[in-house]
Amino acid sequence: LKKMAQEAGVVLTGFVKGHKLHSLLTNARCYCLPSSHEGLPIALLEAMSYHLPVVVSNIPANLEVGLSSDCYFHCGDVDALAARLQKVIDEDYHSVQYDMAPYDWDKIAKQVMGVYEGLLK
């Protein structure tokens, strides 16, 4: 699989962080998350913060992010995934503007603090 991906120009990274992650996301054409299980998909949110087109499975955690329907494919449907990726590749590249306000760390921290303060009363 890794050899086939490399020949096709696909990068299968595994876990990365820091400068390497920044370099990958800065130079990526799109971000794909075909997971069948996720919690809050932080990697997806990171890709969105780089304004990348995204292609993600329609599992509940990804659906909660609230992307446009053309970003999703039915989990496990390899043909649908391939078609969606091909569409992204065939389109002229453009950065995508996402509503990231719900994922603002300062806002989230204040909400969590409010929960703890409420518990202490």
Where do the language-model regions lie?
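Nucleotide-activated donor-binding/catalytic signature segment of Leloir-type glycosyltransferases, i.e.
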Residues: 1-16
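Short alpha-helical donor nucleotide-sugar binding micro-motif in glycosyltransferases
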Residues: 16, 23-28, 112
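Aromatic "clamp/platform" in nucleotide-sugar-dependent glycosyltransferases that forms part
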Residues: 34-36
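Short glycine/serine-rich donor-binding loops of glycosyltransferases
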Residues: 41-44
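Short hydrophobic beta-strand element within catalytic cores of glycosyltransferases
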Residues: 53-56
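Short acidic/histidine- and often glycine-rich active-site loop of Leloir-type glycosyltransferases
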Residues: 59-72
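Conserved acidic donor-binding segment of nucleotide-sugar-dependent glycosyltransferases
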Residues: 71-78, 86-90
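A charged, aromatic-enriched C-terminal amphipathic alpha-helix characteristic of glycosyltransferases
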Residues: 92-120
